[in-house]
Amino acid sequence: MGEIYSPSQSKGFNQPYGYPMNCNLSRVFMEMTEEDRKCLEERKYWCFLLSSITTFCASMILVVIWRVVTHLCCQRREKEFVEPIPAPEAVQINMNGSKHAPSETDPFLKQQEEKHLGWMTEAKDWAGELISGQSLTGRFLVLLVFILSIGSLIIYFYDASFQNFQVETCIPWQDSPSQQIDLGFNIFFLVYFFIRFIAASDKVWFLLEMYSWIDFFTIPPSFVAIYLQRNWLGFRFLRALRLMTVPDILQYLNILKTSSSIRLTQLVTIFVAVCLTGAGLVHLLENSGDFFKGFINPHRITYADSVYFVLVTMSTVGYGDIYCTTLCGRLFMIFFILFGLAMFASYVPEIADLIGNRQKYGGEYKGEHGKKHIVVCGHITYDSVSHFLQDFLHEDRDDVDVEVVFLHRVVPDLELEGLFKRHFTKVEFFTGTVMDSLDLSRVKIGDADACLVLANKYSTNPDAEDAANIMRVISIKNYSSDIRVIVQLMQYHNKAYLLNIPSWDWKRGDDVICLAELKLGFIAQSCLAPGFSTMMANLFAMRSFKTSQTTPDWLNLYLCGAGMEMYTDTLSHSFVGMTFPEAVDLLFNRLGLLLLAIELKDEENKECNIAINPGPHIVIQPQTQGFFIAQSADEVKRAFFWCKQCHDDIKDVSLIKKCKCKNLALFRRNTKHSTAARARATDVLQQFQPQAPAGPMGHLGQQVQLRMINQQSSTSDTHLNTKSLRFAYEIKKLMPSSGGRRNSMSIPPDGRGVDFSKDFEQQFQDMKYDSTGMFHWCPSRNLEDCVLERHQAAMTVLNGHVVVCLFADQDSPLIGLRNFIMPLRSSNFHYHELKHVVIVGDLEYLRKEWKTLYNLPKISILNGSPLSRADLRAVNINLCDMCVIISARVPNTEDTTLADKEAILASLNIKAMQFDDTLGFFPMRHQTGDRSPLGSPISMQKKGAKFGTNVPMITELVNDSNVQFLDQDDDDDPDTELYLTQPFACGTAFAISVLDSLMSTTYFNDSALTLIRTLVTGGATPELELILAEGAGLRGGYSTPETLSNRDRCRIAQISLQDNPYDGVVHNTTYGAMFTIALRRYGQLCIGLYRLHDQDNPDSMKRYVITNPPAELRIKNTDYVYVLEQFDPGLEYEPGKRHF
């Protein structure tokens, strides 16, 4: 150890250094000057310290005295001006009825109160407004105080870090620029202190605040330094505590907006402020020495080393290279460690956690210039995200240059995080919620191309899930009304709430995917054409097809169709002037594309309508948008590039690319002669009419004209026969009323010229349609009138009907059975073609659903159990056209494999049943005429299934993996994807998960969802959506030409080739030849086959779906053909027969 200086030594400090030389020196300092030694002989630190303590004590005493005097004066004033209780006769009643006692002291009291409250209140309000962060002046003042505090702290750092610094210096004030600047800062701090003092409601607590102590220990010493002509380093380091106001200042400036950023800033500033303050006190105590020893043991240490020492000590590392040697310093460190260790252990991990999370999923989205992005929110899990990304980023999509931004409040788990990392070039994730506008701004929702809201399909409370998604849409639309929103909803009746959002606009691209509506619609269409649900599900899902020689033939054919998708593109100029069948034939046979529909532009209403297989009366116009079925988007480009001049002789369709010839004149010529093409289309239509029952509304007008002639020829007879009455009734429906269009059921249209009896009106009561003409309608019926007992059902001749096995109880949420029944009641079917629907389930649950079903005809209910074989036999399940197994119960969330236990048990129960070898007959048509290709609705006798395995059935599943339990004889791997399993390929199973692909399909092509909804729902229109949104259900209306014209629309059908429906089509005919014959002669558009799985087993009824087979495929006489056919107005209802 070096020598220690003591007062007994020479006065001139004989030591070469003013302090001892030892191993704990932090650095080498310059030799003290003679002036520094003389200055330190007589220390004046106590003057600076005493000024701070005196200022505080004086301020506190003055505040206490003021409070005591004010309290005494108030008590005395209250005693002097106590109002005497007035006598009863002195009490007066004023005009408003209240009582008061007149007193001469009233004005004086009021004046005293105003004086007392006047200047004090005004001064307090003025000071409070001046320092408030709500005003611009207050924000500026707070920011200025912080800047000057940091400036004062920087001056302290300079003074404490100077090489030959001393705790006390005798430099005169006028010779020290740092003291002069610091004094100016302290004058401003003094003014700010008085403003805060005036604004404080409690003066005592104000004096005890931390920032007040900072002012007490920094402002008075700067004035004392002028008087003493010396400076003391003192407690100026306390200005570092002003750093804790940084979060408030940044919030005033709207820089900090999220709770995590605010908390992170608070933790960092508190930690830094405490470290700097503690280091300042260690620096002061060590460099001063112990005061009770006469400051003979100072420890020279710089401020930077003090900060290092404090951090190392707080972290409990303690290297020992620097330590405290003075007793005061050690005592301080004992207490500082207790506080600092607790703060270090709690603050540092939280800071690290906030910084780590912020770096991962915080911040803002920074997209590339010119690159689109979408925001996906709602139910974000591994399953929902993986299904979405698998379809959205599929390789078959044409140049998907869109980034996907996921926004969710929960940090992704490891599985989901790994999925994001695999798609890191296309996907980003941010923590937050769309309910917060700050989070919406972080993901740049205003610049996004669309926002997609996903729903939890397995939610135990569907209505609550829909309400949450609707609130998300409201928040998004409130932030940016122009953003396109695509939202998933569980229940159909919740769609109405979206219409209440002012900025919700279907024309702008906003759309809702109702899972219950589409799920039940798919199942309903499978009742009309078994397997159609599988075909449509494969069409809007992106799947790749790869052939393999080891794969069975049936699976290759199925996978070839499963790889097909629905695309849209513009037809080239070479198609302009062609009729729709001509364009379809050319595209299929020459280009290998299947054209399903086109977009028709309504110039008057400036709207576009989708026409599905519209028939030969529609002519292709320039820039017509087509809806295609193809393997990829590149294949669809052939329709856009095809040129008759350049590509007419090309056999290899892969060579059809953009040609270099200039066809502008040809394009104009095609446009010019579009009128001539329409005339040619009329000739083609007349050529098609004798053979094809389907036709446009012009055909229907011809039928009406013939009926009017028949009616005129029969009016001379006194008694009308039944056929004449039927013709007259059709005339009554078609003729417009004198008062215009009427849809009200309360006022019958007049002016018909024919008198009908009440019995006749009652007889045709069940033939009415709803007000839009899109669905069959009947007057509301009581539930009890449609309930069948078991013995009643057994005695009823049920054949060709639909049996719905519904698992539900009284507390089950509504699934919207109307969405299942309405497609089966579409008006493009005649009344006698409607399949009777028998629901087997709980009556109390159906009572809740009945208010949406009582206007739909041909519905019966059997109050029983779908697992009861007696109930199933009573409804003739062996003679039904389709058995549907669905469940309304809340799925099991603990074990997903048990979610479908009832549906699986019901399916296996039916398959294990055996039936008598009975025959069921459909009503035979007595009129002669050509046989319709539809076959079954006109003339067919159906043999009942002898075994339950032959009963046509479709089962709804919640969990995809449970499909392995439906077929016990298949060889599907339990890990096989749903679309690769036999039950799904055969159309006997349907899961709601297949609808996940609709989100990306709708985003890339907003018209695709309209096309799918039109095919699936039977023709739901926006007008009908508004009617149902009112909550009153379907409304009936009298038939008018406008409403009846809505019947003329396309429908799905399944035709058996065993009935030889097409002339010239026999066994082993190519599919392409059958396609052309069906299209040209019958106006039917073939879209697929339903083929037997085992051709060698005559007892096997299992079939699989082939979507859009290749033209060279050979058909078999056992195949069923999926066709899109037009409405046939020639099939009329015969009142003399009963139909189910």
Curated annotation (Swiss-Prot):
GO terms for molecular function: calcium-activated potassium channel activity; large conductance calcium-activated potassium channel activity; metal ion binding; voltage-gated potassium channel activity. Its main location: membrane. Residues 300-322 dip into the membrane without crossing it. Signal peptide: none annotated. The keyword Transmembrane helix applies. Residues 984-1004 are annotated as: Segment S10. A motif (Selectivity for potassium) lies at residues 316-319. Residues 371-514, 799-953 form the RCK N-terminal domain. Residues 66-139, 200-203, 250-264, 353-1140 are cytoplasmic. Keywords: Calcium, Cell membrane, Ion channel, Ion transport, Magnesium, Membrane, Metal-binding, Phosphoprotein, Potassium, Potassium channel, Potassium transport, Synapse, Transmembrane, Transmembrane helix, Transport, Voltage-gated channel. The S4 segment, which is characterized by a series of positively charged amino acids at every third position, is part of the voltage-sensor. The pore-forming domain (also referred as P region) is imbedded into the membrane, and forms the selectivity filter of the pore. It contains the signature sequence of potassium channels that displays selectivity to potassium. Homotetramer; which constitutes the calcium-activated potassium channel. This is Calcium-activated potassium channel slo-1. It comes from Caenorhabditis elegans. The gene is slo-1.
